Amino acid sequence: MARFVDPLVVGRVIGEVVDLFVPSISMTAAYGDRDISNGCLVRPSAADYPPLVRISGRRNDLYTLIMTDPDAPSPSDPSMREFLHWIVVNIPGGTDASKGEEMVEYMGPRPTVGIHRYVLVLYEQKARFVDGALMPPADRPNFNTRAFAAYHQLGLPTAVVHFNSQREPANRRR
Amino acid sequence: MDLKDGGGSERRGAAAGAGAGAAPLARQGSIYSLTFDEFQSTLGGMGGGLGKDFGSMNMDELLRSIWTAEESQAMASASAAAAAAEGGLQRQGSLTLPRTLSVKTVDEVWRDLEREASPGAAAADGGGGGGEQQQPRRQPTLGEMTLEEFLVRAGVVRENTAAAAAMVAAAAAPPVAPRSIPAVNNSSIFFGNYGGVNDAAAAAAGAMGFSPVGIGDPTMGNRLMSGVAGIGGGAITVAPVDTSVGQMDSAGKGDGDLSSPMAPVPYPFEGVIRGRRSGGNVEKVVERRQRRMIKNRESAARSRARKQAYTMELEAEVQKLKEQNMELQKKQEEIMEMQKNFFPEMQKNQVLEAVNNPYGQKKRCLRRTLTGPW
């Protein structure tokens, strides 16, 4: 079941990271046993390891998952927008992200200033990415999801989830 | 007139000890453009001279004598150059005397300055000896130094040290454009100050018939200052300076024959000056505050958006779960109906029980087996 996009519009994920789209695939993400709903708060320490991202869709279709932080290094001055955290390609439909190929290794949220949004974007691939067809981004800062999608002809996203994260006080860090 | 002003300056001198003596300095830039030699001869000529030599005075006494002198003395030549110098000096903020400085004699301070200046000049020149050669040429003795420069370099004007440093640099090496001097000039306040100079100048000139001293030198010294002001203040300062000069001169001549004692103007102007003096800081503070406010508002908007997004997400979730729940209930109803049809002998309660407690049957079985064999 497709999620509503309204929270994404209000949370300015649509606009700052992706364009308006109609969700066609259901994607659920969970850090451990904690499900991620749009706009929920996740402690960075709880997100050290990649989340379990389950997607619907047909087994023959392949999907690309991108996780970025549009608020780096600070929401009021996002000079690094977007900071890339994760890219997984060739995820078969109906499975989870661990069945895909990690193109850019997962990096947990490390918000230094302010509350950052972390956006998980799912694209449907036109075809399987073989090694030569991919252009891995040079660097994590100043990544552009739209440009990446355009370059790899991914079209509009099929699902987006975002959560918030904030720097933890030192004593609460595990 | 002289007495009265002397009293005024004493009062202010006392205040200056507490760090609020910018008024006279700001009101008349002219006196600060005199060199020490000229200043001394001026004091002597007026009869209000102090017996002491400047070198042996401590800084506190020097300032006091400057204030006294400038109170009772007005420069009819307080023209463009003086005005510009005034702008330059005022920009430094209030004339405060650090404790450590006030007890030093002028000579001591001068020696300190010379010691500081030579390595600085050398560094500026890049070569070791070049700077030291130039330095003495520009400021061979204390006597030829202007009061303004001396005070600024001695660090009497402390509030805006960065600006002061930039100014000294500019004054010492005119062709070098100062990098950044905060543009705090405000033309309307500028005019207000010229008014103050006018009145004081006119009054004093009328009362005492004092003639300008050392026009050439001050203008020389002050052209540097005007350059600084021009650069620092950007486009604002240049035009007002010119117009107000004309206005000032005519006003000075017009009022010159009035012998009305207009001396105690400092207080109203002090207000203006204080406003202007702190104007730089206030402007900076206001700007900073505004930036902070904007950031804060953006942050608040983001926070609201976040909250709203989350609320919407939760509402959507609730809606979804409600629908799911209804669907499931409907399904349960159907199943129960089906069970009723398949096992007509079962009562509705039993069916419900079976559905709600699928292990109930099993439990009963277990109990029986437990009780059975023994």
From Swiss-Prot, chain A:
Q: Record's CDD domains?
A: PEBP_euk
Q: What is expression of this protein induced or repressed by?
A: Induced by abscisic acid (ABA).
Quote the InterPro entries the UniProt record gives.
Answer: PEBP, PEBP-like_sf, PEBP_euk, Phosphatidylethanolamine-bd_CS
Q: Which Pfam families match?
A: PBP (PF01161)
**Belongs to which family?**
Belongs to the phosphatidylethanolamine-binding protein family.
Primary role: May form complexes with phosphorylated ligands by interfering with kinases and their effectors.
Membrane spanning residue stretches = none
- Per its record, how is this protein called by name? Protein MOTHER of FT and TFL1 homolog 2
Curated annotation (Swiss-Prot), chain B:
CDD domains found in the cross-reference section: bZIP_plant_BZIP46
Keywords, sorted A to Z: Abscisic acid signaling pathway, Activator, DNA-binding, Nucleus, Transcription, Transcription regulation
Gene Ontology cellular-component terms for this entry are: nucleus
One of this protein's Pfam families, by short name?
bZIP_1
Cited Gene3D superfamilies: 1.20.5.170
GO biological process: one example: regulation of DNA-templated transcription
Q: In which tissues is it expressed?
A: Expressed in roots, leaves and embryos.
Please name the InterPro entries in this protein's record.
bZIP, BZIP46-like, bZIP_sf
Cellular location(s) = Nucleus
Give positions of region: Basic motif.
288-307
> Region Disordered: what ranges?
1-23, 117-142
Q: Where is this region: Leucine-zipper?
A: 314-335
**Composition bias, Basic and acidic residues:** 1-13
Start and end residues of each bZIP domain: 286-349
User: Bias category Low complexity: which stretches?
Assistant: 14-23
Q: Which SUPFAM superfamilies match?
A: Leucine zipper domain
Family of the protein in this entry: Belongs to the bZIP family.
Function, please? Transcription activator that mediates abscisic acid (ABA) signaling. Binds specifically to the ABA-responsive element (ABRE) of the EMP1 and RAB16A gene promoters.
Under what name is this protein listed?
Answer: bZIP transcription factor TRAB1
Q: Which species is this UniProt entry from?
A: Oryza sativa subsp. japonica
> Gene encoding this polypeptide?
TRAB1
